[in-house]
Design a protein with these regions (language model features):
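Solvent-exposed residues in well-ordered beta-strands and their adjoining turns
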Residues: 51, 61, 81, 105-107, ...
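Short beta-strand segments
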Residues: 27-62, 78-79
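A generic structural signal for short beta-strands and their flanking turns/coil linkers
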Residues: 28, 44, 52-54, 72-76, ...
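Anion-coordinating catalytic cores for phosphoryl-, nucleotidyl-, and glycosidic chemistry
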Residues: 12-13, 21, 56, 65-68, ...
Length: 149
């Protein structure tokens, strides 16, 4: 994954790369945007995990609008928002965000899918890993994984 801010107009408001990666790792959710089967914009909130190196993983049901859209149009955008600070007296809002563009992959190996689910467990329920592993095994057949590169 490359850190690129060439298109940002307000350079004074950029997150540095370290904070952007921290936000990517720690944020509770993001909004995945894509083009649906009919060519219309479609955005949906998702849980995600960054693998720490090169990709983002997202889990979902093994069928539905999101997967149908990605099968037809694999280019996506993921927006993650961190801290938000309203400044009413200045008529503005300070917030931090990371916006990624990438290609979604939906036909992943069983091994990669299991790896992604374990990364998600470590992030989303670190205090219940053993129970989470049991849940992953029970629900593996009904869980799809999307990788964004």
């Amino acid at each position: 994954m490359n850190y690129c801010n060439d298109h940002v107009r307000r350079r004074d408001r950029l997150l540095d790369e370290a904070r952007a990666l921290e936000l990517l790792q720690q944020a509770e959710y993001g909004v995945l945007s894509m083009i649906d089967e009919e060519g219309a914009p479609y955005g949906i909130p998702i849980n995600h995990i960054w693998d720490g190196a090169s990709c983002i993983y997202i889990h979902c049901a093994p069928e539905g609008k999101k997967l149908r859209a990605l099968a037809k149009h694999s280019q996506v955008s993921l927006c993650i928002v961190g801290r938000v600070h309203l400044l009413p007296s200045k008529f503005t809002t300070e917030y931090e965000s990371v916006i990624l563009r990438g290609t979604a992959h939906i036909d992943l190996s069983e091994e990669e899918r299991r790896h992604a689910l374990h990364l998600l467990l470590e992030k989303l329920c670190p205090d219940d890993l053993e129970l989470g592993k049991v849940y992953v095994e029970k629900s593996f057949h009904r869980t799809a994984i999307i990788r964004i590169d």
